[in-house]
Design a protein with these regions (language model features):
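Alpha-helical transmembrane segments of compact multi-pass small-molecule transporters, enriched
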Residues: 40-45, 96-110, 125-126, 187-191, ...
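Conserved glycine-rich helix-kink/hinge and helix-boundary motifs of the Major Facilitator Superfamily
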Residues: 35, 91-94, 98, 182, ...
Length: 285
């Protein structure tokens, strides 16, 4: 149950972070926002490191794996998601992103020996279908001129799954979720700022409201990653990945309360029912 609670906490934080991102994008473009959110989490981790960081049992191979994960998660995944959203729309990108648990479960089976049982496999499939229903409104075809961009959300989904599998392997070597998050976000900070310098011809204009919203987003996402890493230390990827993927439930609920543009349709109700049913199947013993 400890693993489920941590995974649910990660899902809730991820879902909330998507809502705060919505507000932040009113004041800053996506890449500028990423250059605020990711470093904000990194700075928070470094600030707390004297309290929570224990270098006594550090393991070099684990540090290298943490850094490898940080080279693409969250930095590259964030950039792929932002560009994919811009070219394909959040609906298509979000729907493809919902397939992450399938790749994570497959990767865990191939590389970690975590072969899921029939119940876990069915529950994962039900959760994926449910989150797809929550992410994909009816009638949203991909423009023909933008179909070449479909590789972006697919790549983001694969990289998210790979991050979970590699992090699980690294945490088996050094059981320090805090180190995993701090090292990963530090590497991602360098990458996202480098990407900004290479792609932007002028210095980005930051304003206080945008910075505040994206700093909050960074803290929420960083806490979500930390909770997910703690869940991975106590449970298998085949359980953690599908539960973390339920974050659209929290995004939908908060959007209905704060943004108030989401209508309850049969599709959404069905998606909620499927997602909750899949989680119950995972929790049931």
């Amino acid at each position: 149950m400890h693993t489920f609670l941590l995974a649910f906490l990660a899902a809730a934080l991820y879902g909330t972070g998507l809502v705060t991102t919505h507000f932040g994008l009113r004041y800053l473009p996506a890449l500028a926002g990423a250059r605020v959110s990711i470093p904000s989490a990194a700075l928070l981790f470094w600030g707390l490191s004297p309290i929570f960081m224990d270098w006594a049992h550090w393991q070099g191979e684990a540090v290298m794996l943490f850094a490898l994960v940080g080279s693409f998660y969250p930095a590259a995944v964030t950039l792929l998601t932002f560009v994919g959203n811009r070219r394909l729309g959040p609906t298509v990108a979000g729907t493809i992103g919902s397939t992450t648990p399938l790749f994570a479960v497959l990767g865990a089976a191939l590389f970690l020996g975590e072969v899921p049982g029939i119940r876990e496999s069915v529950a994962t499939a039900v959760i994926v279908v449910g989150t797809m229903a929550l992410s994909k409104p009816a009638g949203c075809p991909v423009p023909g001129t933008e179909r070449s961009a479909l590789w972006m959300p697919w790549s983001a989904a694969l990289l998210r799954a790979l991050a979970q599998v590699l992090s699980k392997a690294a945490l088996a070597l050094w059981t320090s979720p805090f180190a995993a998050a701090m090292i990963g976000y530090s590497i991602s900070t360098v990458i996202v700022w480098t990407a900004g310098f290479l792609t932007e011809r002028s210095v980005p204009s930051f304003n206080r409201r945008g910075v505040a919203w994206f700093a909050l987003t960074g803290v929420l996402n960083g806490a979500a990653v930390l909770a997910m890493f703690y869940a991975l230390t106590s449970g298998p990827v085949t359980i953690v990945a599908p539960v973390v993927a339920t974050y659209p439930l929290f995004t939908l609920s908060l959007s209905a309360l704060l943004i108030r543009h989401e209508r309850m349709t049969a599709r959404i109700v069905g998606g909620v029912i499927l997602t909750v049913a899949g989680v119950i199947m995972l929790v049931a013993r």
